[in-house]
């Protein structure tokens, strides 16, 4: 009697495993593509530009040209993975109060021959209910 149940049990287990396979590939906390026009993505991008300028040793501000790609990950809050193009402006960093994002975006660009464009990858963590936002990773080239 045991032998007659084995052939049925094995295919049944295989069928169950195959049915559960799509669920196993949808891992909580995985990366999801986001629209570059999404308001949350825009907010994370603005923060990344401000932080880049605050941390950069460059004497001039860089402004956002465009968001190339955006992804997010659900963590405690949300983590945004952004690929962005930044351009060096004519606005010099001076001592005193640093410029905010909107002021930086209004800075003029140098003539085409003198323009310096960067492609940057930023990771921004946002937790709105704690009113926290942090730049967790940055690399530009």
UniProtKB/Swiss-Prot annotation:
Keyword Disulfide bond set for record: yes
One GO cellular component term: extracellular exosome
Annotated signal sequence range: 1-26
Domain Cystatin: 29-129
Molecular function GO terms recorded: cysteine-type endopeptidase inhibitor activity
Tissue: Expressed at a low level by the venom gland (at protein level).
Localization per record: Secreted
Site positions (Reactive site): 29
Keyword Ribonucleoprotein belongs to the record: no
Result after altering residue 29 to S: 1000-fold reduction in inhibitory activity tested on papain
Cystine pairings recorded for this chain: 91-107, 120-140
Family annotation (SUPFAM superfamilies): Cystatin/monellin (SSF54403)
Coiled coil regions in record: none
Entry's family note: Belongs to the cystatin family.
Cited PANTHER family: CYSTATIN-M
Protein name as catalogued: AsCystatin
Organism: Austrelaps superbus
Lineage: Eukaryota, Metazoa, Chordata, Craniata, Vertebrata
